[in-house]
Amino acid sequence: MYAVIKTGGKQYKVQEGDTLRVEKLEGTENGEIEFNDVLMFSDGENVTLGQPAIEDAIVKGHILEQGKGKKVLIFKFKRRKGYRNLRGHRQQYTAVKIDSILV
């Protein structure tokens, strides 16, 4: 049994017991979280598609961690002009463990 959920502008295929990193969500560690945008659900035999989402379908989980990803360096350079610019960015994420899929 699996479902496809939408959060943070991205889609994720999830099953019960899965751990995934999504874009930062509000909440504390060990806090409960629900995803209401369930786009697809499959129980192994039947597939249910939403238009765009399945009504009354909820994926429940809890937050494992709030953190930051690896640093990405952005380096701009123009030759012969003495222009150099170095910036860094660390994207925030939320690690979520999926507990149940309810349809």
Swiss-Prot record:
Superkingdom assignment: Bacteria
Keyword Ribonucleoprotein: yes
A Pfam cross-reference name: Ribosomal_L21p
Any one biological process term the GO annotation gives: translation
Coiled-coil ranges from the UniProt annotation: none
Molecular function as annotated in GO: rRNA binding; structural constituent of ribosome
Keywords of the record: Ribonucleoprotein, Ribosomal protein, RNA-binding, rRNA-binding
Record function comment: This protein binds to 23S rRNA in the presence of protein L20.
Annotated family: Belongs to the bacterial ribosomal protein bL21 family.
Subunit text: Part of the 50S ribosomal subunit. Contacts protein L20.
Name of the molecule in the record: Large ribosomal subunit protein bL21
Originating organism: Desulforapulum autotrophicum (strain ATCC 43914 / DSM 3382 / VKM B-1955 / HRM2)
Gene: rplU
